[in-house]
Regions:
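A glycine-rich, often tryptophan-bearing local segment used as a flexible ligand/cofactor-contacting loop or short
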Residues: 106-178
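Helical hinge/lid and interdomain linker segments adjacent to catalytic or ligand-binding clefts
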Residues: 40, 45-136, 249
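Extracytoplasmic/secreted proteins, especially bacterial periplasmic and envelope-associated proteins
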Residues: 64, 68, 111, 115, ...
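Catalytic beta-strand/loop cores that center a nucleophilic Ser/Cys/Thr
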Residues: 154-239
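Extracellular ligand-binding/catalytic regions of CAZymes and related secreted enzymes
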Residues: 40-45, 49, 68-71, 75-78, ...
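Bacterial Sec-dependent signal peptides at the C-terminal "C-region" and cleavage site
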Residues: 32-42
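N-terminal secretory signal peptides that target proteins for export/translocation
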Residues: 1-17
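Bacterial N-terminal signal peptides
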Residues: 21-32
């Protein structure tokens, strides 16, 4: 009887040979794989909330934002979803998303507000535009006032006008590569009292340049410290006052400002 392999069985030497081949194939896969995968498998997820029953200019800006961020998502491998259903501002529906946007409104019910508070307190990310940050004595949401760095709406210019903006801090990931100043398209600018700059936890990133004053025609802001973009460092958040254009001038039409919008999403979305 000759010695050899028994039919239907694999001896130890063959096991070793197969193992070496598997490891070699895996090494080749790692060597030549370029790291590209579908966004649903790899990229972070963003959910944008917006409303269609608000001021027409707010709706137009939200529609421009949706197109801008869908294009940004396609180019940067993340998932961008959007909804007009603010009831989705709840713990279950927010769970898959690393970042949420409020494009032209804010939550109205206690349940939605409580869900947002929990989401942010547990590491969620937020970018709010224009009226998303609005608060005064009628909104009755003290947590949100603190979240905004203590900033309370005081007044605004009217009509929307373009303005020169100053980049206060170009070391932030949101403002990196921005010019020292740039012209922002027509917008309704909010003045806050107290100013968020007074809060030690707030990092002001962009401010209305004083050379714009007085700004407005019907409603005029004569002077003052007017932060436009800032972050509360206690949270993963950034607020941007842009969001109410007029006279056919679109918020998402300036390259420098668009860079700011893109940087903010990519910064907060990629934060762990």
């Amino acid at each position: 009887m000759t010695h050899g392999t028994v039919p239907g069985k694999i001896n130890r030497r063959n096991y070793i040979t197969i193992g070496i081949r598997v490891l070699f194939a895996f090494a080749l896969l790692l060597l030549f794989w370029d790291g590209t995968v579908a966004a649903s498998d790899h990229g972070f997820k963003v959910l944008a909330f917006y409303s269609t029953d608000v001021e027409p200019d707010h709706v137009h800006t939200a529609n421009d934002a949706l197109a801008f961020y869908r294009d940004l998502a396609a180019k940067n491998n993340f998932v961008f979803d959007a909804t007009t259903d603010w009831a989705k501002l709840n713990e279950k529906d927010l769970r898959p998303y690393r970042l949420i946007l409020w494009l032209n409104n804010f939550p109205q019910t206690p349940e939605q507000r409580a869900a947002f508070e929990k989401y942010m307190e547990h590491g969620g990310g937020w970018v709010g535009f224009h009226v998303a940050g609005y608060n005064d004595e009628t909104t009755k949401w003290p947590w949100f006032v603190d979240f905004m760095g203590g900033a309370v709406f005081y007044t605004n210019n009217w009509p929307p006008l373009p303005a020169k903006l100053v980049v206060d801090d170009r070391t932030s990931p949101a403002t990196k590569d921005l010019p020292a100043t740039f012209m922002s398209p027509a917008n309704e600018w909010y003045l806050w009292k107290p100013s968020p700059r007074l809060n030690k936890d707030v990092q002001v990133l962009v401010t209305l340049d004083p050379s714009n004053y007085p700004i407005g025609i019907k409603d005029v802001i004569p002077s003052g410290d007017l932060p436009v973009v800032w972050t509360n460092k206690k949270y993963r958040m950034i607020y941007m006052n842009m969001g109410h254009g007029a006279n056919g001038e679109k918020i998402y039409s300036d390259p420098a400002q668009n860079m700011l919008f893109a940087n903010a999403i990519l910064w907060l979305g990629n934060q762990k």
